[in-house]
Amino acid sequence: MLKTGKGTEQEVVQVHTRKSSRLFTFFNSQKVVPYVLISPFILSFIVLSFYPTVQAIVMSFQRVLPSEVTFVGLWNYSRILNPTFFTALQNTTTYMILTVVILVSIPMLFAVLLNSKVVKFRILFRTALFLPALTSVIVAGMVFRLMFSESDTAVANQILNWIGLESVEWRYNAWSGMFLMVVLASWRWMGINILYFLAALQNVPKELYEAADIDGANVVQKFFYVTLPFLKPVTIFVTTISVIGGFRMFEESFVFWEAGSPGNIGLTIVGYLYQEGIQQNDMGFGAAIGVVLMLIIFVISITQLYLTGAFKKGDQ
């Protein structure tokens, strides 16, 4: 017997309903839901990070010209071994070490101080410390350039003259140029790191401090034996992002010297990449510099995490 049109329509609706129900059940299962929720991040990572990284690696083996692209093998990497790159590497490493020491130790101490009952108006201080991170680096750099200009009327030189010292040409000496970059970076990011440590301090049980007081522990002993162990995870995190940020630094150098610093005293690896890849339009060589920088950051970060015990299990 032939089925009526009405019966056929009902069967089609039932088939679609069953398919929709299976699809709904599939996407709501405990095994699939986590992947559905993180899929936007995965897609954005592939589009914004993974693909550009692969493209940069491919480009580092090429000579990229406006009219043609030629495969040159390791030629771009062989060109990296030059005095200018080693100067940039030395400047970047020095900057990274100084900023890591400052942006880990000082924010930790400030956070402990702000978390105590000694300081009044703690909420006001926390808000004020976060404001530098919201300030444009270009605006902050221009203010710092005025404060540390070469004239005797600059704020920094007036202070030096007031205590009996001579004026300094801040942007024309190696030590003072490094000082400017480190001070600007510390001013920008110290507040955020303080907030990281403050958040971690909220997880320290107050009972431990009370027990330490009963045992007669002083302030220093309570810091090293009670506070510091609970700050280890966030200390590893802050150290890692400070190391990565130190090697990726570009803005602090650019706002002080723009086109180039005298004697390359402010040249960093990213600045060297910008000069060669963008200004000189040598995209292949610039990509090779970027790949080398990525490898340096990866090796140092993994080594630092291993030495600090970040890969060990919690019960070890």
UniProtKB/Swiss-Prot annotation:
InterPro entries: MetI-like, MetI-like_sf, UgpAE/MalFG_permease
CDD domains per UniProt: TM_PBP2
Superkingdom, natural source: Bacteria
Chief location category: membrane
Gene3D superfamilies: MetI-like (1.10.3720.10)
GO terms under biological process: transmembrane transport
Keyword Cell membrane: yes
Binding partners and assembly: The complex is composed of two ATP-binding proteins (MsmX), two transmembrane proteins (AraP and AraQ) and a solute-binding protein (AraN).
Function: Part of the ABC transporter complex AraNPQ involved in the uptake of arabinooligosaccharides. Responsible for the translocation of the substrate across the membrane.
Family from the record: Belongs to the binding-protein-dependent transport system permease family. MalFG subfamily.
Protein name: Arabinooligosaccharides transport system permease protein AraP
Source organism of the structure: Halalkalibacterium halodurans (strain ATCC BAA-125 / DSM 18197 / FERM 7344 / JCM 9153 / C-125)
